[in-house]
Amino acid sequence: MKQRQFFGTDGIRGKVGAGKMTPELALKLGWAAGRVLSRSGTQKVIIGKDTRISGYLFESALEAGLSAAGLDVMLIGPMPTPAVAYLTRTFRAEAGIVISASHNPYYDNGIKFFANDGSKLDDEVELEIEAELEKPLTCVESHLLGKVNRIDDAAGRYIEYCKSHFPAEQTLSGLKIVVDCAHGATYHIAPSVFRELGAEVIAIGDKPNGLNINDKVGATSMGQICETVLAENADLGIALDGDGDRIMMVNRHGRVIDGDEILYILACDAQKRGVLRGGVVGTLMSNLGLDLALQALEIPFVRSKVGDRYVMELLKEHDWRIGGENSGHILNLDHGTTGDGIVAGILVLAAMQRQNASLEALTANITMLPQVLVNVRFEGDNDPLASEVVLAAQAEVEQKLGARGRVLLRKSGTEPLLRVMVEGDEQEAVTEYANYIADAVRNLV
């Protein structure tokens, strides 16, 4: 298959006003996508965005391009990425478009597409859109231009969808939860969801101003929520990222519960209820502790490349339901078509209620091994992964670690860096081993 030149593994992303993320390219992209999507289906597209100030700019540009190609547009304003996937399905739209750079700072933005079933757009369709980008922009006849409408009740629809994943006979009454919305797309959704299910909610990161998304808050900056959980004597914390597709949690003692531990909780709960349907998909970066804990329960575990797109590929290949990344992208195909931080949090809370157990109790039988990541710059044409010296250092460390450790060497896709990751039982030894391999890379001539 021809390689995509424009789309990455998760759409298009970059600094606003530079590279691909310009108004001109957004206009052309809307038109090109409209040309491809108008060949079949309902002739309508949903557009949602996060809270970045540049969202208005790209929303207008995409809207104009789609209209010029003859497609109707439905705007839903600031909404989580998984909400766009859900509403695309329920409105029988031909596609959904998300304007977001996820966990990146406000000065970045991105554009990604969902197919009509709420899944990521196929590579073949993205290649068709790229082919249209090479053509001069035209406009359909005036009577064929697309119309634009706003879905005023989009937030309410999605709130009810999220709540539907919590058992009707259960309530969160008596729980105090800190919810961190990262000043992002969940700011008007997540607090309402958990309050309406009965919890006492303390919301932080819920006052977006266009410039503060992911700024010292959210799933990639856990300091504030950990402090708030302790200060408020809360039962737990739920931290979402800027577009709401990833989650991290905090137990009552202020300890972070990452994506690997959330996967463990969901897999254990599904196994207890007899609905697991296979095993769990993690990634190359998933902690060995998850692998070992699932082995103890005789739950199969496989690793994909890093990225929720690749997790989804393996889930479909194995016909399994649960997978995700340690960064907090959680997929449960019985509860949606894409990563959804709010829904993942609801599923963990449902497991707590069913088992009458705290977050601490649900993670008592998984021990996360110390993990050290060292980024090493290499020079010239030297490929460290082809170096006998580096490979010998890796083999030596792997022999010392045995079955209770792991080494992963990955090259960066954007710069001459080798990422050296080592896991093992002892922090001091793991750090020593990672630096030993890193030194072998640095000494390459």
Swiss-Prot record:
The active site is at 102 (phosphoserine intermediate). Keywords: Isomerase, Magnesium, Metal-binding, Phosphoprotein. It comes from Shewanella pealeana (strain ATCC 700345 / ANG-SQ1). Activated by phosphorylation. NCBIfam families: glmM, PRK10887.1. The modification Phosphoserine is found at residue 102. Gene3D superfamilies: Alpha-D-Glucose-1,6-Bisphosphate, subunit A, domain 3 (3.40.120.10), Alpha-D-phosphohexomutase, C-terminal domain (3.30.310.50). Belongs to the phosphohexose mutase family. Its EC number is 5.4.2.10. Catalyzes the conversion of glucosamine-6-phosphate to glucosamine-1-phosphate. It comes from the Bacteria. The keyword Phosphoprotein applies. Binds 1 Mg(2+) ion per subunit. This is Phosphoglucosamine mutase. Mg(2+) binds at residues 102, 241, 243, 245. One of its GO terms (biological process) is carbohydrate metabolic process. One of its GO terms (cellular component) is cytosol. One of its GO terms (molecular function) is phosphoglucosamine mutase activity. Its cofactor is Mg(2+). The keyword GTP-binding does not apply. PANTHER family: PHOSPHOGLUCOMUTASE (ALPHA-D-GLUCOSE-1,6-BISPHOSPHATE-DEPENDENT), PHOSPHOHEXOSE MUTASE. It catalyses: alpha-D-glucosamine 1-phosphate = D-glucosamine 6-phosphate.
